[in-house]
């Protein structure tokens, strides 16, 4: 049979226990001893491994408990979503603050058609590209500006173009400027101030914005601007 306790001690000293102890105890058909070894310890890697093993055997409650001990909140939320416990998944994300768990929940909520909630959790996970995509597709224009201001420049420009098409020129100008596309911001500002060919739809207030922008640029502006 061999000295199991001694072998475990040596594996731990060598730092190979996460792989070797499960292998040894499985080979010796001592699964209960393996469960005791893992669950009485606090090794995150082993707890995750045991959780996956429990999940593969359909013992989802045990899997959930050990995923929680390992602070693998993504897996806890995944199990909750699989079982249809969406509200439980929401509570887990709220309590843990886990961004990966929030992203998984957002994808699940989107699949369920719960768009507003999906957008909120995409935002919580800092996946602003998905939040912006859904907000555009579902007419959530009032929230777009906030998402864009927290995102990278390419997304700011994308939202600015969307808002420009919707006639939200002031917001478009602000986003173009923040994204570093000053030339485009000036162009939109000027066109909005002048209106169409007949001068209709003019927004004289945009001249003030235009002046402020050109003053900020000063004499060091690129000739292209």
Regions inferred by a protein language model and the residue ranges of each:
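Extended alpha-helical assembly domains of large eukaryotic scaffold proteins
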Residues: 1-225
